[in-house]
Amino acid sequence: TTVIEQSYFYNKERTSKMLKQLALTTALIASFGTAHAYQAEIGGTIAVVDPDHGDTSTGFALDGTYYFNPVQVKNNPLNEAAFLNRSSNLNGEVSYIDYDVYEVTAFNVGLEYFIPNSDFYLNGNIGQTKHEADGVEDLDTTIYSAEVGYLPVPGLLIAAGLLGYDNDYGDDVDPTLRAKYVTQVGAYDMNFEGGASFGDIDAYSFGTDLYLDKTLSVGLGFSDTDGKDADVFTIRAKKFFTQQVSLEGAIDFADDGNVFGLRGAYRF
């Protein structure tokens, strides 16, 4: 027998203690992973617009979210942890795309607030989009929205609000409705979401995501605008390689072209 085997057979009590310590350490590490919390997320996106008629364009975006309190992942799908924890946050995004004949720069800041010790929810956003082209005056459009929501059961949000815009050519404000529901269907977690705005031109969107496990989702989406050939069909997927690092992709199939998007993000 080897020295290692002799040590094992002649020191059973010591070996037993070591195995117990190893089991305890493994369980402790697992509990750390389950209870991991984060308080911010930053992401970067690249998008390729491939129109049916015209040249391909590329756009870029940066986004960030700061949560007022650490988000506890628990046993939730990683992508839905903040929503299921009702985590209030500040968020923002800036994007740029060059269509050759003109450029579009946009930014947006928002606040999501889950009112403590209640089932009510508030959401507000304001942003601006700038269109720039040679030989013409820049067009700046301010876009804003506000919502009041209610969560009647865990995982379900129903919200109503207003969506408006204002630029040199006009302004408008339309009422909106939105719902989001994260629940378990059979052995899988699923996300269902939908929204609509009502005005001179109605718009609506629907989407669903299937979580194959807590780190991986695949989903479908559809959006359309009343009175225009503006329907968009979306295929999307997202994967968390760790509890901090994620990568997601989407393809939008539209009437006049396709958009391919890829986003990487980091939580801390």
Model-predicted regions and their roles:
Residues 4-26, 30-268:
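Outer-membrane beta-barrel proteins
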